[in-house]
Amino acid sequence: MTLSLANYLAADSAAEALRRDVRAGLTAAPKSLPPKWFYDAVGSDLFDQITRLPEYYPTRTEAQILRTRSAEIIAAAGADTLVELGSGTSEKTRMLLDAMRDAELLRRFIPFDVDAGVLRSAGAAIGAEYPGIEIDAVCGDFEEHLGKIPHVGRRLVVFLGSTIGNLTPAPRAEFLSTLADTLQPGDSLLLGTDLVKDTGRLVRAYDDAAGVTAAFNRNVLAVVNRELSADFDLDAFEHVAKWNSDEERIEMWLRARTAQHVRVAALDLEVDFAAGEEMLTEVSCKFRPENVVAELAEAGLRQTHWWTDPAGDFGLSLAVR
Protein backbone atom coordinates (compact mmCIF):
# COMPACT_ATOMS: atom_id res chain seq x y z
CA MET A 1 0.00 0.00 0.00
CA THR A 2 1.22 3.49 -0.85
CA LEU A 3 -0.50 6.60 0.51
CA SER A 4 -0.11 10.19 -0.67
CA LEU A 5 -2.10 13.28 0.32
CA ALA A 6 -2.24 16.42 -1.82
CA ASN A 7 -3.72 19.34 0.12
CA TYR A 8 -4.96 22.30 -1.93
CA LEU A 9 -6.63 24.15 0.95
CA ALA A 10 -4.98 26.98 2.87
CA ALA A 11 -4.66 26.37 6.60
CA ASP A 12 -7.28 28.99 7.41
CA SER A 13 -9.60 28.30 4.46
CA ALA A 14 -12.33 26.61 6.53
CA ALA A 15 -12.34 29.38 9.11
CA GLU A 16 -12.53 32.06 6.43
CA ALA A 17 -15.30 30.22 4.58
CA LEU A 18 -17.31 29.92 7.79
CA ARG A 19 -16.96 33.64 8.49
CA ARG A 20 -17.99 34.49 4.94
CA ASP A 21 -20.94 32.09 4.90
CA VAL A 22 -22.29 33.15 8.29
CA ARG A 23 -22.08 36.87 7.51
CA ALA A 24 -23.77 36.40 4.14
CA GLY A 25 -26.43 34.05 5.49
CA LEU A 26 -27.41 36.02 8.59
CA THR A 27 -27.73 39.27 6.63
CA ALA A 28 -29.81 37.72 3.83
CA ALA A 29 -33.60 37.54 3.60
CA PRO A 30 -34.61 34.93 4.47
CA LYS A 31 -31.67 34.14 6.72
CA SER A 32 -29.74 30.96 5.96
CA LEU A 33 -26.73 28.88 6.98
CA PRO A 34 -25.10 26.37 4.58
CA PRO A 35 -25.47 22.69 5.50
CA LYS A 36 -21.75 21.96 5.25
CA TRP A 37 -21.36 23.55 8.70
CA PHE A 38 -23.48 20.82 10.32
CA TYR A 39 -20.54 18.45 10.21
CA ASP A 40 -18.25 19.03 13.16
CA ALA A 41 -17.52 15.94 15.30
CA VAL A 42 -20.91 16.16 17.04
CA GLY A 43 -22.78 16.76 13.79
CA SER A 44 -21.01 13.91 12.01
CA ASP A 45 -21.96 11.55 14.85
CA LEU A 46 -25.57 12.74 14.74
CA PHE A 47 -25.72 12.22 10.99
CA ASP A 48 -24.36 8.70 11.42
CA GLN A 49 -27.24 8.10 13.85
CA ILE A 50 -29.70 9.56 11.31
CA THR A 51 -28.60 7.08 8.64
CA ARG A 52 -29.66 4.23 10.96
CA LEU A 53 -33.11 5.61 11.80
CA PRO A 54 -36.17 3.69 10.57
CA GLU A 55 -37.53 6.82 8.87
CA TYR A 56 -34.31 7.59 6.98
CA TYR A 57 -34.42 5.29 3.95
CA PRO A 58 -31.80 6.84 1.56
CA THR A 59 -28.63 5.36 3.06
CA ARG A 60 -29.85 1.79 3.44
CA THR A 61 -31.66 1.86 0.08
CA GLU A 62 -28.59 3.01 -1.81
CA ALA A 63 -26.53 0.39 0.07
CA GLN A 64 -29.07 -2.26 -0.93
CA ILE A 65 -28.66 -1.36 -4.61
CA LEU A 66 -24.88 -1.47 -4.32
CA ARG A 67 -24.99 -4.77 -2.44
CA THR A 68 -26.81 -6.41 -5.33
CA ARG A 69 -25.36 -4.45 -8.25
CA SER A 70 -21.71 -3.62 -7.46
CA ALA A 71 -20.31 -6.40 -9.65
CA GLU A 72 -22.53 -5.24 -12.51
CA ILE A 73 -21.48 -1.62 -11.98
CA ILE A 74 -17.78 -2.46 -12.04
CA ALA A 75 -18.20 -4.69 -15.09
CA ALA A 76 -19.89 -1.82 -16.91
CA ALA A 77 -17.32 0.76 -15.82
CA GLY A 78 -14.23 -1.42 -16.30
CA ALA A 79 -12.40 0.87 -13.88
CA ASP A 80 -9.17 0.15 -12.01
CA THR A 81 -9.34 3.41 -10.02
CA LEU A 82 -12.13 4.45 -7.64
CA VAL A 83 -12.48 8.19 -7.05
CA GLU A 84 -14.84 9.00 -4.20
CA LEU A 85 -16.15 12.52 -3.68
CA GLY A 86 -16.53 12.22 0.09
CA SER A 87 -14.66 10.61 2.94
CA GLY A 88 -14.24 7.04 1.73
CA THR A 89 -14.99 5.38 5.04
CA SER A 90 -18.43 3.97 4.35
CA GLU A 91 -19.72 0.46 3.83
CA LYS A 92 -20.77 1.55 0.34
CA THR A 93 -17.19 2.39 -0.64
CA ARG A 94 -16.07 -1.07 0.38
CA MET A 95 -18.78 -2.75 -1.71
CA LEU A 96 -17.36 -1.10 -4.82
CA LEU A 97 -13.74 -1.76 -3.84
CA ASP A 98 -14.62 -5.42 -3.16
CA ALA A 99 -16.22 -5.72 -6.59
CA MET A 100 -13.14 -4.19 -8.23
CA ARG A 101 -10.88 -6.56 -6.31
CA ASP A 102 -13.06 -9.57 -7.19
CA ALA A 103 -12.84 -8.57 -10.86
CA GLU A 104 -9.04 -8.30 -10.48
CA LEU A 105 -9.18 -4.66 -11.57
CA LEU A 106 -8.43 -2.77 -8.36
CA ARG A 107 -5.27 -0.67 -8.45
CA ARG A 108 -6.01 2.69 -6.96
CA PHE A 109 -8.31 4.62 -4.59
CA ILE A 110 -8.60 8.42 -4.68
CA PRO A 111 -10.71 9.89 -1.86
CA PHE A 112 -11.56 13.60 -2.19
CA ASP A 113 -12.68 15.59 0.86
CA VAL A 114 -12.31 18.97 2.57
CA ASP A 115 -10.96 17.36 5.77
CA ALA A 116 -7.34 16.17 5.66
CA GLY A 117 -7.77 14.26 8.94
CA VAL A 118 -10.70 12.30 7.54
CA LEU A 119 -8.69 11.53 4.42
CA ARG A 120 -5.73 10.23 6.42
CA SER A 121 -7.88 7.94 8.56
CA ALA A 122 -9.87 6.74 5.54
CA GLY A 123 -6.69 6.11 3.59
CA ALA A 124 -5.12 4.14 6.43
CA ALA A 125 -8.26 2.03 6.90
CA ILE A 126 -8.64 1.25 3.20
CA GLY A 127 -4.93 0.54 2.85
CA ALA A 128 -5.08 -1.98 5.68
CA GLU A 129 -8.05 -3.77 4.10
CA TYR A 130 -6.78 -3.80 0.52
CA PRO A 131 -3.06 -4.68 0.49
CA GLY A 132 -1.20 -3.43 -2.54
CA ILE A 133 -3.66 -0.62 -3.29
CA GLU A 134 -2.32 2.81 -4.23
CA ILE A 135 -4.08 5.64 -2.36
CA ASP A 136 -3.82 9.20 -3.69
CA ALA A 137 -5.93 11.37 -1.39
CA VAL A 138 -6.91 14.89 -2.44
CA CYS A 139 -7.90 17.55 0.08
CA GLY A 140 -9.87 20.25 -1.66
CA ASP A 141 -13.16 22.02 -2.24
CA PHE A 142 -15.79 20.74 -4.69
CA GLU A 143 -16.17 24.22 -6.16
CA GLU A 144 -12.48 24.80 -6.86
CA HIS A 145 -10.38 21.66 -6.95
CA LEU A 146 -12.13 18.89 -8.92
CA GLY A 147 -9.55 19.43 -11.63
CA LYS A 148 -6.80 18.48 -9.17
CA ILE A 149 -7.97 14.86 -9.00
CA PRO A 150 -5.17 12.79 -10.60
CA HIS A 151 -5.80 11.64 -14.17
CA VAL A 152 -4.46 8.13 -13.67
CA GLY A 153 -5.87 4.78 -14.72
CA ARG A 154 -9.43 4.19 -15.80
CA ARG A 155 -11.49 6.00 -13.21
CA LEU A 156 -14.92 5.46 -11.72
CA VAL A 157 -15.88 8.71 -9.98
CA VAL A 158 -18.59 8.14 -7.36
CA PHE A 159 -20.82 10.78 -5.76
CA LEU A 160 -23.20 8.88 -3.53
CA GLY A 161 -25.80 9.54 -0.84
CA SER A 162 -27.80 11.92 -3.05
CA THR A 163 -25.43 14.63 -1.84
CA ILE A 164 -26.03 16.16 -5.29
CA GLY A 165 -29.49 17.06 -3.96
CA ASN A 166 -28.00 19.58 -1.53
CA LEU A 167 -27.27 21.77 -4.54
CA THR A 168 -30.04 23.87 -6.07
CA PRO A 169 -30.43 23.67 -9.88
CA ALA A 170 -27.95 26.36 -11.01
CA PRO A 171 -25.04 25.31 -8.74
CA ARG A 172 -25.89 21.67 -9.48
CA ALA A 173 -25.63 22.26 -13.23
CA GLU A 174 -22.31 24.04 -12.76
CA PHE A 175 -20.98 21.24 -10.55
CA LEU A 176 -21.97 18.50 -13.00
CA SER A 177 -20.50 20.44 -15.92
CA THR A 178 -17.21 20.96 -14.07
CA LEU A 179 -17.15 17.30 -13.08
CA ALA A 180 -17.85 16.24 -16.67
CA ASP A 181 -14.91 18.33 -17.85
CA THR A 182 -12.57 16.31 -15.61
CA LEU A 183 -13.62 12.96 -17.12
CA GLN A 184 -11.39 11.41 -19.76
CA PRO A 185 -12.30 8.73 -22.33
CA GLY A 186 -12.86 5.50 -20.40
CA ASP A 187 -13.84 7.28 -17.17
CA SER A 188 -17.33 6.94 -15.69
CA LEU A 189 -19.47 8.73 -13.10
CA LEU A 190 -21.66 6.85 -10.61
CA LEU A 191 -24.25 9.27 -9.22
CA GLY A 192 -26.72 8.56 -6.41
CA THR A 193 -30.08 10.36 -6.51
CA ASP A 194 -33.01 10.21 -4.10
CA LEU A 195 -36.27 10.06 -6.05
CA VAL A 196 -39.58 11.89 -5.68
CA LYS A 197 -42.04 9.84 -3.63
CA ASP A 198 -44.85 10.06 -1.07
CA THR A 199 -44.62 13.43 0.69
CA GLY A 200 -45.25 11.93 4.13
CA ARG A 201 -42.31 9.55 3.81
CA LEU A 202 -40.07 12.34 2.59
CA VAL A 203 -40.89 14.65 5.48
CA ARG A 204 -40.56 11.89 8.10
CA ALA A 205 -37.08 11.07 6.78
CA TYR A 206 -36.03 14.60 7.77
CA ASP A 207 -38.14 14.93 10.93
CA ASP A 208 -37.75 11.66 12.83
CA ALA A 209 -39.77 10.76 15.90
CA ALA A 210 -36.65 10.46 18.09
CA GLY A 211 -35.58 14.05 17.36
CA VAL A 212 -32.12 13.15 16.08
CA THR A 213 -32.51 15.28 12.94
CA ALA A 214 -33.73 18.18 15.08
CA ALA A 215 -30.54 17.97 17.18
CA PHE A 216 -28.48 17.72 13.99
CA ASN A 217 -30.15 20.84 12.58
CA ARG A 218 -29.65 22.88 15.76
CA ASN A 219 -26.02 21.77 15.94
CA VAL A 220 -25.14 24.29 13.23
CA LEU A 221 -25.90 26.98 15.82
CA ALA A 222 -23.50 25.31 18.26
CA VAL A 223 -20.81 25.41 15.57
CA VAL A 224 -21.35 29.14 15.03
CA ASN A 225 -21.37 29.75 18.79
CA ARG A 226 -18.07 27.91 19.28
CA GLU A 227 -16.19 29.08 16.20
CA LEU A 228 -17.42 32.68 15.97
CA SER A 229 -18.23 33.49 19.62
CA ALA A 230 -21.96 33.79 18.96
CA ASP A 231 -24.69 33.50 21.59
CA PHE A 232 -27.43 31.50 19.86
CA ASP A 233 -29.76 29.83 22.36
CA LEU A 234 -30.23 26.42 20.74
CA ASP A 235 -33.38 25.69 22.74
CA ALA A 236 -34.97 28.88 21.38
CA PHE A 237 -35.11 27.41 17.87
CA GLU A 238 -37.25 24.52 16.68
CA HIS A 239 -36.53 22.18 13.80
CA VAL A 240 -38.88 22.40 10.81
CA ALA A 241 -38.85 20.08 7.78
CA LYS A 242 -41.19 20.73 4.87
CA TRP A 243 -41.76 19.65 1.29
CA ASN A 244 -41.52 22.36 -1.36
CA SER A 245 -43.71 20.92 -4.11
CA ASP A 246 -42.80 23.60 -6.66
CA GLU A 247 -39.06 22.88 -6.39
CA GLU A 248 -39.52 19.19 -5.49
CA ARG A 249 -37.23 19.40 -2.51
CA ILE A 250 -37.20 18.94 1.25
CA GLU A 251 -36.22 22.08 3.15
CA MET A 252 -34.89 22.19 6.70
CA TRP A 253 -35.42 25.36 8.66
CA LEU A 254 -34.82 26.61 12.20
CA ARG A 255 -37.78 28.58 13.55
CA ALA A 256 -37.36 31.11 16.36
CA ARG A 257 -39.77 30.19 19.17
CA THR A 258 -39.66 33.77 20.45
CA ALA A 259 -38.05 37.03 19.35
CA GLN A 260 -34.25 36.67 19.49
CA HIS A 261 -31.31 39.06 19.50
CA VAL A 262 -28.08 37.30 18.58
CA ARG A 263 -24.54 38.64 18.67
CA VAL A 264 -21.76 37.06 16.62
CA ALA A 265 -18.75 38.60 18.33
CA ALA A 266 -16.08 37.38 15.90
CA LEU A 267 -17.90 39.13 13.05
CA ASP A 268 -18.93 42.17 15.09
CA LEU A 269 -22.43 41.33 13.87
CA GLU A 270 -25.79 41.57 15.62
CA VAL A 271 -28.96 40.09 14.17
CA ASP A 272 -32.59 39.96 15.24
CA PHE A 273 -35.08 37.15 14.74
CA ALA A 274 -38.81 37.82 14.98
CA ALA A 275 -40.91 35.26 16.80
CA GLY A 276 -41.73 32.56 14.25
CA GLU A 277 -39.03 33.69 11.80
CA GLU A 278 -37.44 30.79 9.92
CA MET A 279 -33.83 30.38 8.83
CA LEU A 280 -33.03 27.95 5.98
CA THR A 281 -30.30 25.41 6.81
CA GLU A 282 -30.56 22.76 4.09
CA VAL A 283 -32.31 21.80 0.90
CA SER A 284 -32.45 18.21 -0.29
CA CYS A 285 -33.67 18.11 -3.87
CA LYS A 286 -35.44 14.96 -5.06
CA PHE A 287 -35.33 13.72 -8.62
CA ARG A 288 -37.41 12.06 -11.30
CA PRO A 289 -35.59 9.48 -13.46
CA GLU A 290 -36.14 11.41 -16.68
CA ASN A 291 -34.81 14.60 -15.07
CA VAL A 292 -31.62 12.83 -14.00
CA VAL A 293 -31.01 11.85 -17.64
CA ALA A 294 -31.70 15.42 -18.77
CA GLU A 295 -29.43 17.05 -16.17
CA LEU A 296 -26.59 14.69 -17.00
CA ALA A 297 -27.06 15.41 -20.72
CA GLU A 298 -27.05 19.16 -20.08
CA ALA A 299 -23.63 18.71 -18.45
CA GLY A 300 -22.34 16.76 -21.45
CA LEU A 301 -22.79 13.32 -19.89
CA ARG A 302 -24.64 10.30 -21.26
CA GLN A 303 -26.40 7.96 -18.86
CA THR A 304 -25.47 4.40 -19.88
CA HIS A 305 -27.00 2.46 -16.97
CA TRP A 306 -29.72 3.04 -14.37
CA TRP A 307 -30.19 0.95 -11.25
CA THR A 308 -32.91 1.35 -8.65
CA ASP A 309 -34.41 -0.56 -5.73
CA PRO A 310 -37.65 -2.56 -6.16
CA ALA A 311 -39.74 0.25 -4.63
CA GLY A 312 -38.20 2.92 -6.87
CA ASP A 313 -37.06 5.04 -3.93
CA PHE A 314 -33.48 5.68 -5.03
CA GLY A 315 -31.52 5.62 -8.28
CA LEU A 316 -27.91 5.09 -9.31
CA SER A 317 -26.75 6.39 -12.70
CA LEU A 318 -23.64 5.36 -14.57
CA ALA A 319 -22.67 8.08 -17.04
CA VAL A 320 -19.84 8.84 -19.46
CA ARG A 321 -18.82 11.81 -21.60
Curated annotation (Swiss-Prot):
GO terms for molecular function: L-histidine N(alpha)-methyltransferase activity; protein methyltransferase activity. Belongs to the methyltransferase superfamily. EgtD family. S-adenosyl-L-methionine binds at G86, K92, D113, D141, F142. Consists of two distinct domains: a typical methyltransferase domain and a unique substrate binding domain. Its EC number is 2.1.1.44. Disruption phenotype: Cells lacking this gene are unable to synthesize ergothioneine (ERG), but do not show growth defect. Deletion of egtD from wild-type M.smegmatis and a mycothiol (MSH)-deficient mutant does not affect their susceptibility to tested antibiotics. The ERG- and MSH-deficient double mutant is significantly more sensitive to peroxide than either of the single mutants lacking either ERG or MSH, suggesting that both thiols play a role in protecting M.smegmatis against oxidative stress and that ERG is able to partly compensate for the loss of MSH. InterPro entries: EgtD (IPR035094), EgtD_Actinobacteria (IPR032888), EgtD_Methyltrsf_superfamily (IPR051128), MeTrfase_dom (IPR019257), MeTrfase_EgtD-like (IPR017804), SAM-dependent_MTases_sf (IPR029063). NCBIfam families: egtD_ergothio. L-histidine binds at Y56, N166, Y206, E282, V283, S284. GO terms for biological process: ergothioneine biosynthesis from histidine via gamma-glutamyl-hercynylcysteine sulfoxide; methylation. It comes from Mycolicibacterium smegmatis (strain ATCC 700084 / mc(2)155) (Mycobacterium smegmatis). Keywords: Methyltransferase, S-adenosyl-L-methionine, Transferase. It is an enzyme of class 2 (transferase). Catalyzes the SAM-dependent triple methylation of the alpha-amino group of histidine to form hercynine, a step in the biosynthesis pathway of ergothioneine. Among all the proteinogenic amino acids, only L-histidine is a substrate. Monomer. It holds the Pfam family Methyltransf_33. This is Histidine N-alpha-methyltransferase. It catalyses: L-histidine + 3 S-adenosyl-L-methionine = hercynine + 3 S-adenosyl-L-homocysteine + 3 H(+). Pathway: Amino-acid biosynthesis; ergothioneine biosynthesis.
